[in-house]
Amino acid sequence: MSQQREPKPRPAPGADPETEPYWKATHEGRLMVQRCTACGAHQLYPRWRCLRCRGQVEWVDAGGGGTVYSFTVIRQNFSRSFRHLIPYVVALVDLDEGPRLMTNLVGIEPDDVRIGMRVRARFERVSEDASIPLFEPDPASA
């Protein structure tokens, strides 16, 4: 007989100097991206310089809206942090500001997810001092 173990919480992100502003904002319920001060391009994952022109970047609040670019449904996972969530959706979301973010879609049955659907950010606390962005269907687009 196999022994059932309690699910573990989702892993908390590890912040470094480049990502600390991002993770601090998510814990406050805000989504941030970097914007180039020279060309205005937005980017995420954080970097020291603009990917387009190598200019300086600054952190700006993102609106939290986006569109599903692609997704997959996870139906098997052996990690105690995720096994209890099965089935769950991992998606690439194109933020309205431009960057593409890998995330989980929540609040929707996996069979109802569609490429091109509008979603919005919400935040899940995963530890005392960390939250992660997840996305859910945007009711304004229904």
Task: Name these PLM-found stretches.
Residues 42-43, 57:
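Cys/His-rich microdomains that often coordinate metals
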Residues 30-33, 47:
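Residues immediately within or flanking Cys/His clusters that coordinate Zn2+
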Residues 35-38, 49-52:
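Short, cysteine/histidine-rich loop/knuckle motifs that typically chelate Zn2+
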Residues 66-68, 105:
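Conserved hydrophobic positions within beta-strands
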Residues 71-77, 124-128:
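Short, conserved beta-turn/loop elements at beta-strand boundaries and strand-helix junctions
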Residues 85-101:
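Short, basic/aromatic beta-hairpin or loop at an interaction surface
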Residues 1-31, 141-142:
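A broadly conserved sequence feature marking short terminus-proximal activation segments
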Residues 4, 98, 103-142:
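Well-ordered alpha/beta subsegment
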